[in-house]
Amino acid sequence: MSDIIIDLSRDSKFDELGLKRLRESYMMREETSPQERFAYVCKQVGTDRDHSQRLYEYTSKHWLSLSTPILSFGKANHGLPISCYLSWIEDTKEGLIDTLSEVNQLSMLGGGVGVGVGIRTSDNKSTGVMSHLNTYDACSLAYKQDGVRRGSYAMYLNNNHPDVLQFIEMRKPTGDHNIRCLNLHHGLNISDEFMELIEKCDGGGNIDDTWNLIDPHTKKITTVGARDLWQRILETRMKTGEPYICFIDTCNKHMYDFQKKKGLTIKQSNLCVAPETMILTEDGQFPIKDLEGKIIKVWNGNEFSSVTVVKTGTEKELLEVELSNGCTLSCTPEHKFIIVKSYTEAKKQKTDDNAIANAERVDAQDLKPRMKLIKFDLPTLFGNSEHDIKYPYTHGFFCGDGTYTKYGKPQLSLYGDKKELLTYLDVRTMTGLEDASGRLNTWLPLDLAPKFDVPINSSLECRMEWLAGYLDADGCVFRNGTNESIQVSCIHLDFLKRIQLLLIGMGVTSKITKLHDEKITTMPDGKGGQKPYSCKPIWRLFISSSGLYHLSEQGFETRRLKWEPRQPQRNAERFVEVLKVNKTGRVDDTYCFTEPINHAGVFNGILTGQCSEIILPTDSTRTAVCCLSSLNLEYYDEWKDNDLFIKDVMEMLDNALTIFIEKAPPTISRAVNSAKKERSIGIGVLGFHSFLQQKNISFESDEAAKLNIDIFTKLRSKIDTFNLVLGSLRGSPEDAEGTGRRFCCTMAVAPTATSSIIMGNTSPSVEPFRANAYRQDTLSGSFLNKNRYLSRILSQRLNVKEINEVWSNIVSNGGSVQQLPNNLLSEQEKQVFKTAFEINQKWVIKHAADRQKYIDQSQSINLFLKPDIHKRELHSLHLNAWKSGLKTLYYLRSEKIADADKISSNHMINSINFTNIKESIKDSIKVSILEVRNKEKNYEEKICKLTNGRRLSGCFACE
């Protein structure tokens, strides 16, 4: 193929920033002009010399914007001309390993990768979604695109997956680091069923909004509130810009029939404890096994939070963690313990409402002796009188001092000062006389609860009476100066642990230690002599002075033991420390829940952790492949009647697919398989807003809507025509066999931020400009980017110095022109040059919905919202997007308040030299400054006092 003829004069179509970006990111060192880069690439992807020459003409005239992989093709030895891949993680060992390997390979070849996640939640065969996503998060940094920039991975999960709440928040900078994946992008596949439920709730009334979360493997169902889930999605989008939204049923509904007939579907645009573990809930403490499948409220260290308990596995290896307060927990090696590194960190906890959520988490298998667990508050449970036992004080006393006769009847022998407690005891019968040793023998009611039963979940009154009885029987008061505590000893460790749980339900922490091991002791033999006896190990339960004070605040008192409640000056409780971790060899079923706020729950009295635009079908045998490029609508009037333009672009993309199929390494066979069977391309656009501004048409107008529909109607018609032409010349792929088509799918509106800069700062994709002037940083320095059409207007009306001063004003106002005087810009022109954040986003949705019917794949639609948007409006926009038939939503861009509303008046005044601006304009700008000052004043009156000056979307105080 002979060389392409280039036209160096076309370098003038680039601005300085576009040239810098091309040279820094795309051009080879020996290339001195962008024309050489265009010619080289067009030669690689052209069918013959004439086709290549025409492609060069299109690109050099800025009619056609080549995708990054095509534009950089040849610069990296291993790069391939494919922009996007969609993969699917099959829930098998092979699927997990193979997909990870393939995705890393695809990233290194220069493409962005979307990954559908079909992994089950945590069980004995899977550690759940988030642990795998952590691996992908690390790989996105390790395996760079073309060895230059970090990989771009977007993970997609169905909104009925049990791990959806953790998945939604994985890009939040705070919270459990084990679920943070800040280097990944993420999207949610949202079903029609869910949106229909949200729409139903939208009408108000008492609607049952129960939403089933279904494990993709076990099909086990848990539930959440649909409204709560929807609110979490929208709030997270406001805070982080993500997750992307894919209305999955809309995507599948609009697949071509020939794809549906093949059964293809679109799937994307372990912290567990043993069954007997006691969980602190709002209703009491219960074995986690008994709570399986139930929605309950658990204590997370600060408050009660709704969760669903699930069985996470069978025959899982368990470790036993022993702690200094006598508590033990049998859990999986990965179960998270919440650790405090230092006393300094512990002090910060007192003033940090998010201390638990933000604290360090350590796997059980990685715990070391003397590691300190975080302190936490305990609630006082009022309990349930249905669980009360009869004669609570008497039963408590019986547990300490009572025995059974040989006939199995409960009895007490009172001695010393305990005889004075007779009036408090429920006695069935008694001797009336003391025996030879001075004891008073009594027999208790036959319906007394069994000895060592502890009424953990009874009413608070019942628990206090029972505890008073037990401590009066076996307890002792220890005094250290004015500091008093109560200790009680017993040979039955499990019994003391149940008392420890009872105290937890009363808001009190306690400690159990071993008083002594089993030993031989010489004791009186009852016959006047002594002899050796075998003594069992003895354990001691310790209630501190702060614990006693807390009990006294609830009305607790003992009859025999005398102590004075003293309010502690500070939380002097010692930190609970790790003693050791035992590998017991135990294998058992496991259970857990996902607590959404602190990611924590109280287990056996211990607070620990708990457990877009390319829409193509994927499965275990295929990774979808799409080759992209965009048509520049800014030059639409130049190319719309060129009969070869669309055909040449489609032929070029087909050639790029062939290059991929022939040169792809065998390690990405699923992607090659998909490319062969589908041959899907994605023709998109950029420059839509520039096209409107060029014609002085407002984005928010019926005229813009008419042009939008007209453009995409004609594009769809031409693309369909040339799809059949190329099909007749080159044949149809397997999936489209019998249709005459060359490509299964042909259109996708992708984001084009970088391409827009290269194309002379045209507007990106189909979205509005974010600002009419802004600074852009590159490797070569900082550049002031100005709207070209606005610049032309200003140059016709002002001199150079005045223009510079007006640009300063625009920059100071966040790129807006709305504050400029009407004798400089008319009201119509101000409408035309509205920025993305000033445009009513209903128009963004309308234009997207109008063109969606002509686009067989999807669009990357960004929303631009003020941070103080009412949550009702936020909800309505997203609901309307679904109802309007949009397939996907991309980023939600939220303008910073500091830039949007609170503009510094002094900075504005210093930016403008009034002496050199025409008097009429000068006076008008002064007025606009006063308006901004008033705006600032009004804003300050509305500042939320609860968020340190930040307005919080969704905050009732702010609304």
Curated annotation (Swiss-Prot):
Residues of the site described as Allosteric effector binding: D91, R120
PROSITE patterns registered for this protein in UniProt: INTEIN_ENDONUCLEASE, INTEIN_N_TER
EC number: 1.17.4.1
Site label Important for hydrogen atom transfer, positions: C84, C626
The reaction(s) this protein catalyses: a 2'-deoxyribonucleoside 5'-diphosphate + [thioredoxin]-disulfide + H2O = a ribonucleoside 5'-diphosphate + [thioredoxin]-dithiol
Domain DOD-type homing endonuclease per the UniProt entry, residue ranges: 378-508
Assembly notes: Heterotetramer composed of a homodimer of the large subunit (R1) and a homodimer of the small subunit (R2). Larger multisubunit protein complex are also active, composed of (R1)n(R2)n.
Name of the protein: Ribonucleoside-diphosphate reductase large subunit
Organism for this UniProt entry: Invertebrate iridescent virus 6 (IIV-6)
